[in-house]
Amino acid sequence: DRCVFIDDVGLPVTPEKIGIIVAKSLITPESNKVLAGVPCSMILEDEIPKIGGELIWIRVGDVFVCEELKKHNAALALEISAHFFAPGLTDFIFDDPIIFSLKLAEYLHKTGSNLSQLSRDIPSYPYEEMKFSCPDALKFKVNEYLTDFFSSKGYKVETIDGVKIWLDGGWVLLRPSNTQPVMRMFVEAMDKPGLEKIKSEFKSYFDDAVRAIS
């Protein structure tokens, strides 16, 4: 139920870039919304409006994605885990890697483009995912603590799924796993030094939250 893509020079292409490319042939005036799981790259915020789309951040998970697709009459949805949904191409709403791959191939054929060039035309930013041990009995309490803490500090906070904090030049998402005793941290920044700074700062916030609750 997933698909990953390697370009014509042997390099992997991120799900976000694939979503942007395929969206060019799926977005219509009647259905221009693109849904993305909150851990996805901020390149979507820059690139989707350029092709006439409206980006909506959503919660991770197939059930939630399908509900949001119906709610918004969206053209497509994607997750960082390489799940892609294109409801206009299938009789039912589900993540169909085969038809999405065919749609990409069709776009490349019609435009005479190669995937490596299309990928290079879209910016890339340093991105990292980490996970920290956190007992099941604590992880959701930690999430609530961090949400309150960051909100009180005046950060721009998104709480669709975990707590996502928007920063100057990047963002960080702290999200309790639904299946494991861990908290995951996703970080993206405009450059590598910025990424390392965010990682260090927000890992400390996580450690402080665990100590405060334990």
Annotate the PLM regions.
Residues 2-19, 44-45:
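Short Gly/Thr/Asp-enriched flexible loops that form oxyanion-binding sites at enzyme active sites
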Residues 11-29, 33, 59-60:
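Short, acidic/small-residue loops that bind anionic groups at enzyme active sites
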Residues 6, 28-214:
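Phosphate-binding and adjacent anionic-ligand microenvironments
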